Amino acid sequence: MRNDPVISARTLIGVPFRLHGRAPDLGLDCVGLVVVAYGLSENVPTGYSLRSRDLAHWERVIRAQGFVRRHAGWRRGDLLLVRPGPAQIHLGVWTGDSLIHADAGLGRIVETPGI
């Protein structure tokens, strides 16, 4: 059984943002946050940019990790795939009332109330 992803993600709050980062001591991006929080190790994407329009690609990547798509009724510990801008796709860990994610603008992992 995997560790609680919310507890794991909260330990990462404040870790510096680093594109393609996979190690908390060096920095994480949103994919790295998900890799660490959910304890993933196989088929982890690389070579992507901060901008992407290919939502279908990211949905396939997420399904390949065993996650199930849900449009509403999110639960604590769910992985959220969101589109914060027209050319941006983002991942985060839903706590039940906030989203833990890698914020490139703020330069670190943060917890944002609501969504």
Where in the sequence are the language-model features?
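Active-site nucleophilic cysteine motif
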Residues: 22-41
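Short secondary-structure junctions and interdomain/linker hinges
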Residues: 16-19, 69
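A glycine-biased structural micro-motif
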Residues: 10-14, 21-22
